[in-house]
Regions:
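Sec-dependent N-terminal signal peptides
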Residues: 4-14
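Transmembrane beta-barrel domains of Gram-negative outer membranes and organellar outer membranes
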Residues: 21-151, 162-166, 174, 179, ...
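Active-site glycine- and acidic-residue-rich loops that bind
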Residues: 159-161, 196-197
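Short helix-loop boundary/capping segments
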Residues: 176, 180, 186-201
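A contiguous pocket-lining binding segment that forms or flanks enzyme active sites
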Residues: 201-210
Length: 226
């Protein structure tokens, strides 16, 4: 009987030790794997300067935004010290209200001065970049419809007053300091001049670079193709 007990102990204890080793190794491997979490605060707001970012207004939050497009800075193009390098010349003013239906879906309305546009918009966050790079970029879809109330003989019917815009917004946060956004855009205008086209494509890009925890440099640029 004693021999049988000794034999059982010899068999069981090494097995238990091996199982404990396997469990410990598995725990260490799981801890070493990067956790899959969404990358937060890629940009601080839903717009950089003139272009949209991947960000949306959070659920049940309201964003009221007044944007100004000033005049030319250079003296040769109408700017100069007499109008404070374009600041006195407001080329466009846009007042918008945006609301977060969910953390990924926002809607909005706006009024723009230049073409006397009334706008409706929607933006949806399709994908969020993850910390483990399983999803390397954030992707959002944006759509806007504008209706001009400008008094013009060119608008012979109301259908001419509509402009439609759709965007696919691609963004990546490369580090805690640098975030980049790239925006291909398609625009359809129901009414255009004789030498213009109804459908146009454009590319926009921009970045945010944080040089202190509370200060950043932001930049964006857009180019019409064709």
């Amino acid at each position: 009987m004693k021999k049988l007990i000794a034999f059982i102990l010899i068999v069981l204890f090494p097995s238990a030790f091996l199982f404990a080793q396997d469990d410990l190794l598995k725990m260490l491997q799981d801890e070493s794997k990067p956790k899959r979490e969404p990358v937060l605060a890629m940009f601080k707001t839903n717009k950089l300067i003139n272009i949209h970012t991947n960000e949306t207004v959070r659920k049940r939050n309201l964003d009221v935004r007044i944007s100004h497009l000033f005049g030319n800075m250079g003296k040769e193009s109408g700017g100069g010290v007499h109008n404070l390098y374009g600041i006195d010349q407001s080329a466009d003013i846009r007042m918008g209200v945006h609301y977060g239906i969910t953390d990924h879906l926002m809607v909005g309305v706006a009024r723009a001065k230049r073409n006397e546009d009334l706008e409706g918009l929607v933006k949806y966050r399709i994908l969020d970049q993850t910390t483990d790079n399983a999803i390397p970029v954030s992707v959002s879809a944006f759509a806007n419809i504008a209706y001009s109330v400008k008094e013009s003989a060119d608008f012979k019917n109301d259908n001419y007053r509509f402009v439609y815009c759709s965007q696919l917004i691609l963004a990546r946060k490369f580090s805690s300091r640098l975030s980049v956004v790239f925006v291909p855009t398609f625009t359809h205008r129901n009414f255009v001049g004789a030498d213009d086209e109804n459908n146009t494509w454009s590319l926009s890009g921009g970045f945010r670079f944080k040089f202190t925890p509370s200060a950043s440099v932001i930049f964006d640029y857009s180019k019409t193709l064709g």
